[in-house]
Amino acid sequence: MYVTEKHLDKYEKLAGIFKEGLDKLDGVLSVNVALTSENQVSRAEKSESRFQIDATDIIAVASGKGGVGKSTFAVNLAVAMSQLGKKVGILDADIYGPSVPRMMGISGRPEASPNKKLIPLESYGIKCMSIGFLVSVDTPTIWRGPMVMKALEQMFNGVEWGKLDYLIIDLPPGTGDAQLTLAQSSKLSGSIIVSTPQDVALNDARKGINMFKRVNVPVIGLVENM
């Protein structure tokens, strides 16, 4: 985990929370989080965020390809953090294949608040928002890039998230326009790459790591699912 020296204390605390949460997941034998200081572009020097959420830390869970357990990991990470007493939200940014509603056991449509923002549905004490709440399960999302980005912006800025300790973003698989825009337009504290042991999956995972490095988002770690 590469961090800036200025915020080392903050990331040491975050690393401890990650380790404690990951240790509780079934099938995890051991977890080691190593911190390395490096000089990076400061938040103030980045372009101003288009996506505004009042969260202490925003963590993106990404993968180079689909079918590697990215969404499963994102949901389990959110639940583990919630069980540690943190205020957690999960945003399903996988517009074309939303799976968080089913994994969290939620159905129904979000209601609107008096200020015309959507109220996220809750499960296991976690606030959840997904395009899957707004379209039928059997309806394909046949949208071009601009419509996808508009929907993502709505799920950030048009939702009553409240104050969160952590927002977990389940990104779409790959390294396309949606992933790049989310990385550049939201104040990500870090990212986690999920992969499987196969060479093809690991090659795609490297692309994801390189994408986050280019936009100066720390890669917290790589999770290898079996």
State what each model feature region is.
Residues M1-L22, A34:
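A short interface-forming secondary-structure element
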